[in-house]
Design a protein with these regions (language model features):
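Conserved beta-strand positions in the central sheet of alpha/beta enzyme cores
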Residues: 3-4, 157
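Conserved aromatic-histidine-acidic binding/catalytic patches
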Residues: 4, 8, 133
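Active-site beta-loop-alpha junctions enriched in small/polar residues
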Residues: 7-8, 38-43, 161-163
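An alpha-helical appendage that flanks or caps ligand/catalytic pockets
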Residues: 18-147
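Hydrophobic anchor at the start of a short beta-strand
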Residues: 35, 155-156
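C-terminal/domain-terminus segments
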Residues: 146, 158-169
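Structural motif
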Residues: 151-153
């Protein structure tokens, strides 16, 4: 099986399957390969903005962890950052470049999956939150989860920010 980043749609889950099946042994079967997506899942109140203070507080740490990961992938392997971070990428890389290279790896993951440090709050955009977290009304979440399940996602592991975790879970 696999624990993976949250696939934002059923189509994305199908792309994940295509990658897994490409070089898989002949006996590989979706039915026997368990998939789990790691994300923060938040039930949005009617009319609430995706980037509301409450949503940022409850799932911002997960969104920022994905930005940390994108930076590491870019820095270590030259991978293109995802479109969801395009609007903040230049400012984010500038912020991190201010830290000495020999200590930067420690700074990159500060607060990782627990909280968002104050100077990184500015990078919690609507686009980043939508791309990395499962946010919606109860009906929207049910619809999205059903579509992902039909595409072969078996489980969602909900990892909210540390401080509000008991309220969220």
């Amino acid at each position: 099986g696999a624990v993976m980043a949250f696939p934002g749609s059923a189509a994305m889950m199908e792309n994940i399957w295509a990658m897994l099946e490409k070089d898989a042994p002949a006996e590989f079967s979706r039915d026997s390969f368990y998939t789990t997506a790691l994300t923060a899942m938040i039930v949005k109140e009617e009319g609430e903005a995706i980037d509301s203070p409450r949503i940022k507080h409850e799932c911002g740490a997960m969104a920022m962890a994905s930005l940390h990961y994108a930076y590491d992938q870019w820095r270590n392997f030259g991978y293109q950052p995802p479109n969801a971070v395009a609007s903040v990428w230049e400012d984010y890389t500038k912020l991190l470049s201010a830290f000495p290279e020999e200590r930067r790896h420690q700074r990159i993951h500060l607060g990782h999956n627990c909280w968002v440090i104050p100077e990184e709050q500015q990078f919690l955009t609507k686009e980043l939150l939508q791309a990395t977290c499962l946010i919606g009304t109860q009906e929207e979440l049910i619809e999205k989860l059903r579509a992902l399940n039909e595409a072969g996602l078996n489980q969602v592991m909900n990892l909210p920010s540390f401080d509000p975790r008991f309220d969220v879970l």
